[in-house]
Design a protein with these regions (language model features):
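Conserved ATP-binding/catalytic motifs of P-loop helicase motor domains
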Residues: 1-398
Length: 398
């Protein structure tokens, strides 16, 4: 009965993806921003994990944490330098080889950020270590190819284009052998304004639309999204400096095999009473979600976020970096903590980078394009974060 209730919540195409995945088929789940890719992916992960060894991976640490998995690089010991070839794929330790050899299903999230040599690198690493290759297991990939693309410098890009016809995973040598069934979700759940959705799709497909000119303004409204981190830092510094009162500093506790960039928290958090902050996790009682924006309050040693006139306590949160291990007793692969950052799960919320905003939703957004977008998909991701056109402002000159 419970399973039927879950399936009843799905759209027709979500249900199609769910059914194909549970039948063991290779599936490429695509779709516009806000169509429920993450929601249905997590349903599939939970169901497949009951009867198979499923490894869930993503190209970045933050994306891996968001989907509840590990990074591609840590799982398959992928080299972080150069275009991946058979000769520079790593021989693995026995415990890592046991993990890879036991994988029945591999799900890769944020596939738009995966280069062709990364997918080939996974396959070649598996084969080099005597394991089943990608063409011998179930592979599910999830993401919107019109959103954020792999970030690389010009030298690396030219190296990659000497071997491949393009820069995304579909140009990998292994791609055609996987024979993906493609499901594209097209029912947008984040926005309901049809005209707005139509013009978002024009931008998504690389076109230009004069529709967005009417949102041009000189003043900000809501959270600022910007392509460049330097712009984000200026807004957040200006917002913090505008607050009077004492500056409070909280350093994170980091331990294990990890680095600061593996997490979405601040290694050094600086806040003042009254400053604008964003909550970065889902609270246990679901009163706060990742992306909730409010006001920072400090009462004695206690920290709070004020939302809609109500104050919620902020406690330090342990964010874990995990890697897969093989449990010989259960013959299952399991996620094991290898490092962690413990910090208050908040950050200044006057501005955030477009890259960091992927997957988030806001009622009011100012898109600051005074420094232009530098990567494919940035403009579309920025525009599509807002729930309604009435909440959108665009700045092109400061």
């Amino acid at each position: 009965m419970e399973q039927k209730n879950i399936e009843m919540k799905l759209s027709k195409k979500q249900q199609e993806f769910y059914d194909l995945a549970l039948r063991g088929k290779n599936v490429f789940l695509s779709g516009k921003a806000g169509t429920g890719k993450s929601f249905v992916s997590k349903l599939v992960i939970n169901e497949l994990a009951k009867k198979k060894n499923i490894a869930v991976v993503a190209p970045t640490g933050v994306a891996a944490t968001n989907i509840g998995g590990a990074t591609m690089h840590s799982t398959f010991s992928l080299p972080i330098y150069g275009v991946m070839e058979f000769q520079n794929c790593n021989f693995l330790r026995s415990e890592k080889r046991a993990v890879i050899n036991s994988i029945d299903t591999l799900l890769i999230d944020e596939i738009s950020m995966v280069r062709p040599d990364m997918l080939d690198g996974i396959h070649l690493t598996m084969k080099k270590n005597g394991c089943r290759g990608l063409d011998e297991i179930q592979v599910i990939v999830v993401g919107d190819m019109k959103q954020l693309q792999p970030v690389m410098d010009d030298n690396f890009k030219s190296m990659l284009l000497k071997k491949y016809q393009g820069l995304d995973f579909t140009y990998s040598n292994i791609f055609k052998k996987l024979n993906f069934s493609t499901i594209e979700l097209d029912e947008v759940l984040r926005q309901s304004d049809n005209e707005f959705i139509t013009h978002l799709n024009v931008v998504r497909d690389g076109g230009k639309s004069n529709y967005f000119r009417k949102f041009l303004a000189n003043e900000t409204k809501g959270i600022v999204l910007a392509p460049h981190n330097s712009t984000v830092k200026k807004y957040n510094k200006k917002g913090l400096d505008a607050q009077s009162g004492e500056l409070f500093t909280y350093d994170a506790h980091i331990e294990g095999k990890c680095k600061e960039t593996d997490f979405n928290f601040e290694s050094r958090l600086e806040v003042k009473d009254g400053c604008k902050i964003m909550y970065l996790v889902n609270s246990k009682n679901n009163q706060l979600v990742n992306g909730t924006i409010g006001t920072f309050r400090k009462r004695g040693d206690n920290l709070f976020i004020e939302v809609g006139g109500e104050q919620f306590a902020i406690d330090r949160f342990k964010s874990e970096k995990k890697e897969y291990v093989y449990n010989e007793q259960t013959e299952k692969i399991e996620l094991q903590e290898v490092g962690s950052m413990t910090q208050y799960p908040i950050k200044l919320a006057y501005a955030v980078s477009i890259h960091k905003s992927q997957g988030m939703t806001f009622d009011e957004v100012t898109l600051d394009l005074s420094m232009p977008c530098f990567a494919e998909g940035q403009l579309y991701v920025g525009l599509s974060r807002v729930t309604s056109p009435s909440g959108l402002t665009i700045i092109v000159n400061r």
